[in-house]
């Protein structure tokens, strides 16, 4: 079973700022794919990815985080490992943005949405 989860870690070191990374999405996609492939080769149950400092511009967050979700989902469809990918977020508001991006791009049905219990 494929799984993507969010973990709020306020003290975690960001892997970068979305404002600076939005112009490097193909490079980021390759880096994420390499991390997923390494986790698959090691048969890791869990791959935990560091947080990103989100942008004040939602469009940039959708561009970067959307590609992150798409990359993870494509890998999980083709590979058994990692069984779960945990995306760290710096704040609850960041986790909400991640959920919004996920729900925009990934689920085909309402039941597949990532929900914190705050929405319908």
Residue ranges of predicted features:
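Macrodomain-like recognition of ADP-ribose-binding/processing modules
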Residues: 1-120
């Amino acid at each position: 079973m494929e799984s993507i989860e969010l973990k709020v870690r306020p003290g975690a070191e960001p892997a970068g700022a979305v404002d600076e990374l939005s112009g490097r999405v193909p490079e980021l996609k390759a880096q994420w794919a390499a991390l997923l492939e390494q986790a698959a080769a090691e048969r890791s149950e869990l791959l935990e990815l560091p947080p990103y400092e989100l942008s004040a511009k939602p469009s940039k967050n959708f561009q970067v985080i959307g590609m992150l979700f798409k990359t993870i989902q494509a890998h999980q469809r083709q590979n058994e490992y990692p069984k779960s990918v945990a995306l760290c977020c710096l704040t609850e508001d960041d986790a909400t943005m991640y959920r919004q991006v996920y729900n925009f791009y990934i689920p085909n049905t309402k039941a597949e949405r990532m929900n914190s219990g705050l929405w319908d």
